[in-house]
């Protein structure tokens, strides 16, 4: 998976959370993570490295785990 594809999935998760009426902070976290990932200068192998993910502003531990899983398996 490319980082663009992963960012699109994170945006889709944010939209689905909004439709479900979830916590606005959680929705914003996914949307911000998607934007941060789109502008991230690294390549796909870096998305499987927890240290590299931790350096991306706007990506917390929980979302970093989801990104790592998506990069490794192409599914959640």
Where are these regions (language model features)?
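Long, highly charged, low-complexity intrinsically disordered interaction regions
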Residues: 1-76
């Amino acid at each position: 998976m490319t980082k663009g594809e992963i960012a699109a999935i994170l945006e889709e998760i944010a939209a689905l959370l909004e439709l479900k009426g979830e916590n606005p902070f959680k929705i914003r976290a996914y949307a911000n993570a998607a934007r941060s990932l789109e502008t991230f200068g690294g390549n796909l192998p870096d998305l499987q490295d927890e240290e590299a993910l931790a350096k991306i502003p706007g990506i917390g531990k929980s979302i970093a785990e989801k990104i790592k899983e998506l990069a490794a398996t192409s599914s959640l």
